[in-house]
């Protein structure tokens, strides 16, 4: 477990951004990188969250949220919207809208 956590932490530290879908934030939480960060809440064992994710601000009711380079979403369905938001943030909203249109996805860029 420790080797995986070390490799994950190093990869995320070196990355320009980090996307977490549903309970993937639980994996990253163990590295300490999410301490004092906001993360979209997800359905998971509440006891486990209390034990291993102290110091992480889980935001209830949000489909997705970004905090710095960290993007998290509460469901797999919300991952598409989060992805287009990341494209918009890092490239341009027009690029995200064009890609969404090309694949036939109805993305609301106002979020």
Task: Please give the residue ranges for each predicted region.
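Active-site-adjacent pocket-lining segments in enzyme domains
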Residues: 1-111
């Amino acid at each position: 477990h420790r080797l995986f956590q070390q490799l994950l932490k190093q990869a995320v530290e070196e990355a320009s951004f980090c996307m977490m879908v549903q309970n993937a934030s639980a994996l990253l939480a163990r590295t300490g990188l999410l301490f004092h960060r906001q993360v979209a809440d997800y359905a998971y064992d509440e006891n486990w969250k209390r034990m291993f994710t102290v110091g992480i601000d889980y935001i209830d009711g949000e489909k997705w949220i970004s905090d710095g380079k960290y993007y998290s979403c509460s469901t797999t369905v919300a991952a598409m919207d989060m992805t287009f938001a990341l494209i918009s943030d890092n490239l341009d909203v027009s690029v995200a809208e064009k890609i969404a249109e090309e694949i036939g996805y109805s993305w609301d860029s106002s979020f």
